[in-house]
Amino acid sequence: MIKLCNENEIKVEFVKKSGKFYSVQFRAEINFSKKENIIKIYEDSLIDLMNTYNKMVEEKDKLTYEEVINIHLAHEFYHYLEHRDKKYTNDILEPICTFQLLSFKKEASVLKCSEIAAHKFCKEVLGLKYLPNIYDYVYLIETGEISLTNFNNMITSWKKELIS
């Protein structure tokens, strides 16, 4: 992935920080400018994710540092492609109605669609078994930020939404 970033003139910057801003944990981010495009990789955050995940799985399923880096580079590279082509996933999809009163209707795009597409892109490009956000969910469960019960409830809720 680093080679692909270099070929597309995307600078990859490794930052020895946790990537935590207020209550949001960043693992990587891409910044666009006319001068240069930069993907920042928050090494401490990725190492923490990798170590926490690796405690939970069998030896054959453990993540390497290179795999964790490539997962996050692929994810951010998808956002680069959206930006470069000016085709943002949330704009391609039909907007949803967020409010309606009589004939007044307010619609919006769903920004989360771009994140989901980036996860799917990453999974396909790297040949992963699962969408890569599973690593974040394992991390959140293992660190106690969400309970396994709450996670299972989320999955049940998602299934109901997909069926309806």
Regions found by a protein language model. Name each.
Residues 12, 41, 73-79, 135:
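Generic structural hydrophobic/aromatic packing signal, biased to beta-strands
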Residues 17-70:
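Active-site scaffold of zinc-dependent metalloenzymes
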Residues 93-164:
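Metalloprotease/metallohydrolase-associated module, dominated by Zn2+-dependent proteases
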Residues 36-52, 64, 84-91, 95-96, ...:
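Conserved binding/catalytic microenvironments
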Residues 62-70, 74, 107, 111, ...:
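Short capping loops/turns at secondary-structure boundaries
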Residues 68-88:
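Active-site recognition of the HExxH zinc-binding catalytic motif
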Residues 1-25:
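Basic, amphipathic N-terminal segments that precede the first structured/catalytic domain
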Residues 5, 77-81, 122:
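Hydrophobic, Leu/Ile/Phe/Ala-enriched alpha-helical segments that form helix-helix packing faces
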